[in-house]
Amino acid sequence: VVGQNSPCSSYAIAKPIAERSAGKVGMISTDTHWDSRPIDYLTGDERIAGSGNWKSKTFSSFANFSIPNLVEIGERGMLEEASVVRNYMQRGAHFYPMWKVRSELGIAGLCKELRHAYEGTDDVYVHFDMDILGGAGPAPGDILGELAEPMGMSDYEIIRLAHEIGKRGLTGMSFICIPPGSMVTYRLIVYIIAFLIAGLALSRSD
């Protein structure tokens, strides 16, 4: 599903995957922010899975979404509360900020870490938040006006990641934070989908 924001292109995809899965569900999420506030800050309504809390709402609503099978990639924003991130880490989440990707793992090393989403799971949900590009990738530096942070993921890195995910398989995926009128980002999403499909095809030919 390709959409502009949450919950229509995040929680709304995670929910049916969880409801239809016979076992545990892993998640691979690329993002600049954790989107894991305890409550939606725009409405203050605990029922809402909004842009800032859809991920925490997913894990609190569906017991088969497994935090030890969460692979969280790309965050480097300074808007997060440390207690929120530490809570996920203490519960077994696998976190790869862009600093770690660039200074230690590289894209090849990062792709190896995708295994955590698949270990012991029956399904995997993949979420591409395109604000991960802001500040370095092909998206405008002021992606959606305010979401850019330094050390963004490059177009090659996100395409390579999608290709490797395709080789491993997935149940469903979604895109959000697509800059309106950004033709290069639109094209990048087409590349992500195409290279992911190529990965699926390669896995089935082996």
What annotation goes with each model-predicted range?
Residues V1-D206:
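Conserved alpha-helical scaffold segments that buttress catalytic/binding sites
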